[in-house]
């Protein structure tokens, strides 16, 4: 029952680890007019047919994993697009209408199965000429006095077109071209009485004029379309009466476009005499000062602009025009005033522009330390953005284009001008070791204009390093092997740690410590480990060392690695004969065995081969080269055969045996073995000797007999002790018995000088004749005094001899001797010719030599 949650927890942790090790996919940025990328700066005409393929999302995954695309919309809005998750093809599924919705917000995302990256995009809906002009404030019925001056403004019609650009610009014209009394300004829609034309109340009290409003045309579904609308203006002619001047066509609104030339006429104020009789002349003048920007014609009432509108800072100017009737002298002049509103119409002819401290600038650079605090402002960037247009034409958005989520820009929407502030969003992503240079584009794009003017500025951030990294070894452990006879100061292994930081922070200092580091040193700068100058390595004493190395930077940040050093055995020991026996007796058909040991640590240096180097006579004995067993030749099957081999006819033999190891160079030792040969019939004279000979091939029988004897001795001892105890108890006296056991001192070793003996005829029991410093028949004093080659420190004493070997030593008839004689040639110690090859160091698999590690623990 408990295994399920544990498995789920392990799978969850594994999934988190894999997600952290997996880098997120990202979109490709697209430029203006591109239909492939992340939909930045993407716009779509409103007349695009439903079902059209309008865009292709395009991105990539750093690991090359399969990616999928998605698009979503706010629940309160329409789902205008659909996307193919595999290929990123975006299809229009809802009809567009710019007049109702001029931009569409959507969230596009890209996923590699583990990571999901989402971006919010704004798709701009561009205009198509799908709207016709529409007259406002209909019907148009006006009253005009009959004495209105020729060229005067009579009325102003107004039509609007919801389209933008040329499709939203309206021009006016008259349909009844046969009528020559009236004309219309094609841009302003002002209806005027043509020059030279007059109105006559008596002849015609009303005039009907058809006005056509036509847009500038535009593209609609692939074709050029022009829409128009018509209306009728009814002009009722009034009889002139004796009244004050009357303004015609009020209210007065004038529009001056930004590209209008100085001196151009803006509008005409028309005032007439209200009298029905003979009209008086009207004079016009401006009551308020216009700062020299506008002037009015005294007689016609035409208002003109004197300065370039592009230089004007105000958007609206309010003027007051006064008209005065020119009467006969002495008559009071009738006057009237009217307000005139003139609006400066801004043309969207300025894109947003970035400014630095010295003027317009499209590249801004900054140096800063890595990992700044979250929310910190990049105060080194002095950026101002400005759009010289007015009103809606000067409204634009700001955004950063580049690696997402690192910085954000404030403000995001600007009207005319703003100071740009860039704030840190993701401090961890600002990493000197990952990227020394961060590059972004600061994008300013207009919001509510059909042109969508935009500009960009490059933001280049040069990162400065800080000590934010720990030195790391290239491996968690290092393994080296060096010969045991390497001289002091020999190179062992070079460890390497890397600190990604730069300058002093990236310098690594190495040190060494641990229980196995006494014999080693490390170079603090290079990481080279070498032996102490006085170090003497011995594989037979300690063959393996392990210790730790430390890599530390100047601020104390450090990491550790473990070093394993294995000493390679060198053949620096002679074989040594184990048994110190002078004589032996060989029973016909039973081999003798000699044994020598080599204290080298590894094969083949400690493997010993045996051979007979000298014998008199020859061709009597054979020796097994691997086990050291000595046998008679197969042709010798009886004592009589032996008796006839030599002139002396005896059964005593002398052999010189050599023990030679398999190392390179090879060392050897010789020993002299004296053998008496007998048979089982002669051994039957001694019961103990016969028993030992019989049980030689069955040692368990000897052990059983020995155990029985010991049991009997113990039983007798217990009985005697019990009887003594009860006797003393009856006499109320217990006498302690104290036995002092002393170990017999071992006899001092002495040198035995053995001469080669001539064989002579004797009885079978006759011994060899020896010449020695002090005659001794039972001790091994046959060691020849020659110089011993240098060798490693002594190993612990060898294990005790097996019981079978002891049994052989106790045979009463043993009369042979074994005399080790080392080879006169001394070994030449091996030295390292150079540093240990790095290929040996890199053999990491040596750490896993489990068989060796299980058998030999590190010291």
From Swiss-Prot:
Biased composition of type Polar residues is found at 805-816
- Distribution of this protein across tissues and organs: Expressed in cone and rod photoreceptor cells (at protein level). Expressed in photoreceptor cells of the outer nuclear layer of the retina. Expressed in mitral and tufted cells in the olfactory bulb.
Glycan attachment residues as annotated in the record: 58, 89, 288
Q: Where are the transmembrane segments?
A: 702-722
Topological region Cytoplasmic: 723-859
Question: Subunit structure, per the record?
Answer: Interacts with PROM1.
The protein depicted here goes by the name Cadherin-related family member 1
This protein's species is: Mus musculus
């Amino acid at each position: 029952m408990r295994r399920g949650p544990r498995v789920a927890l392990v799978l969850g942790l594994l999934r988190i680890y894999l997600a952290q090790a997996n880098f997120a996919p990202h979109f490709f940025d697209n430029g203006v007019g591109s239909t492939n990328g992340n939909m930045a700066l993407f716009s779509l005409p409103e007349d695009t047919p439903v079902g059209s393929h309008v865009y292709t999302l395009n991105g990539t995954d750093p690991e090359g994993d399969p990616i999928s695309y998605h698009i979503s919309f706010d629940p309160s809005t329409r789902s205008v697009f659909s996307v193919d998750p595999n290929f990123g093809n975006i299809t229009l599924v809802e009809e567009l209408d710019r007049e109702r919705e001029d931009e569409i917000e959507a969230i596009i995302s890209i996923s590699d199965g583990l990571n999901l990256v989402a971006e919010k995009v704004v798709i701009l809906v561009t205009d198509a000429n799908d709207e016709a002009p529409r007259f406002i404030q209909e019907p148009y019925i006006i009253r005009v006095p009959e004495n209105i001056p020729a060229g005067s403004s009579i009325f102003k019609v107004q039509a609007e077109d919801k389209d933008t650009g040329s499709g939203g610009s309206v021009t006016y014209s008259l349909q009844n071209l046969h009528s020559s009394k009236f004309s219309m300004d094609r841009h302003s829609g002002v209806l005027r009485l043509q020059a030279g034309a007059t109105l006559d109340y008596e002849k015609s009290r009303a005039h009907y004029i058809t006005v056509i409003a036509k847009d500038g045309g535009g593209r609609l579904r692939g074709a050029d379309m022009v829409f128009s609308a018509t209306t009728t203006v009814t002009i009722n002619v009034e009889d002139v009466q004796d009244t004050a001047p009357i303004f015609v066509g009020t209210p007065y609104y004038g529009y001056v476009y930004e590209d209008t030339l100085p001196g151009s006429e803006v509008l005409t104020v028309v005032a007439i005499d209200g009298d029905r009789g003979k009209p008086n002349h009207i004079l016009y003048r401006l009551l308020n000062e216009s700062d020299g920007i506008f002037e009015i014609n005294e007689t016609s009432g035409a208002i003109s602009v004197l300065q370039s509108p592009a230089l004007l800072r105000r958007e609206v100017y309010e003027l007051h025009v006064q008209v005065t009737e020119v009467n006969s002298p002495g008559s009071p002049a009738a006057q009237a005033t009217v307000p005139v509103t003139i609006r400066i119409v801004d043309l969207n002819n300025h894109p947003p522009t970035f400014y630095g401290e010295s003027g317009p600038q499209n590249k801004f650079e900054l140096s800063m330390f890595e990992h700044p605090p979250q929310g910190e402002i990049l105060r080194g960037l002095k950026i101002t953005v400005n759009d010289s247009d007015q009103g809606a034409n000067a409204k634009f958005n700001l955004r950063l284009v580049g690696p997402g989520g690192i910085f954000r820009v404030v403000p995001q929407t600007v009207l005319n001008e703003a100071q740009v502030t860039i704030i840190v969003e993701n401090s961890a992503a600002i990493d000197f070791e990952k990227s020394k240079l961060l590059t972004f584009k600061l994008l300013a794009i207009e919001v509510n204009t059909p042109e969508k003017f935009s500009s960009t500025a490059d933001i280049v951030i040069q990162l400065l390093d800080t000590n934010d990294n720990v030195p790391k070894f290239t491996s968690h452990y290092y393994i080296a092997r060096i010969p045991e006879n390497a001289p002091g100061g020999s190179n062992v292994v070079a460890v390497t740690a890397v600190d990604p930081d730069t300058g002093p922070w990236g310098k690594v200092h190495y040190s060494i410590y641990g229980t196995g580091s006494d014999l080693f040193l490390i170079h603090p700068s290079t990481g080279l480990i070498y032996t102490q100058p006085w170090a003497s390595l011995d594989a037979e004493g300690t063959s393996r060392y392990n210790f730790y190395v430390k890599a530390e930077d100047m601020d104390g940040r450090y990491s550790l690695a473990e070093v394993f050093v294995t000493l390679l055995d060198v053949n620096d020991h002679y074989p040594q004969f184990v048994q110190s026996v002078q004589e032996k007796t060989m029973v016909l058909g039973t081999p003798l065995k000699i044994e020598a040991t080599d204290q080298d640590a590894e094969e083949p240096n400690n493997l010993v081969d045996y051979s007979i180097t000298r014998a008199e006579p020859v061709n009597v004995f054979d020796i097994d080269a691997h086990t050291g067993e000595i046998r008679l030749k197969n042709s010798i099957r009886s004592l009589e055969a032996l008796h006839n081999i030599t002139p002396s006819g005896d059964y005593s033999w002398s052999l010189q045996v050599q023990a030679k190891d398999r190392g390179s160079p090879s060392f050897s030792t010789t020993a002299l073995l004296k053998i008496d040969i007998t048979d089982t019939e002669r051994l039957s004279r001694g019961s103990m000797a016969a028993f030992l000979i019989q049980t030689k091939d069955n040692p368990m029988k000897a052990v059983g007999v020995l155990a029985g004897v010991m049991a009997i001795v113990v039983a007798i001892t217990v009985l005697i002790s019990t009887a003594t105890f009860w006797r003393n108890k009856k006499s109320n006296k217990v006498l302690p018995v104290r036995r002092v056991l002393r170990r017999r001192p071992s006899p001092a070793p002495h040198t035995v000088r053995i001469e080669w003996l001539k064989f002579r005829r004797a009885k079978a029991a006759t011994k060899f004749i020896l010449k020695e410093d002090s005659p001794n028949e039972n001790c091994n004093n046959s060691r020849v005094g020659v110089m011993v080659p240098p060798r490693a420190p002594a190993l612990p004493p060898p294990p005790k001899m097996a019981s079978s070997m002891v049994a052989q030593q106790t045979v009463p008839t043993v009369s042979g001797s074994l005399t080790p004689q080392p080879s006169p040639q001394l070994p030449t110690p091996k030295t390292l010719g150079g540093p240990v090859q790095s290929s040996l160091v890199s053999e990491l698999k040596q750490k896993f030599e489990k068989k060796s590690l299980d058998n030999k623990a590190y010291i």
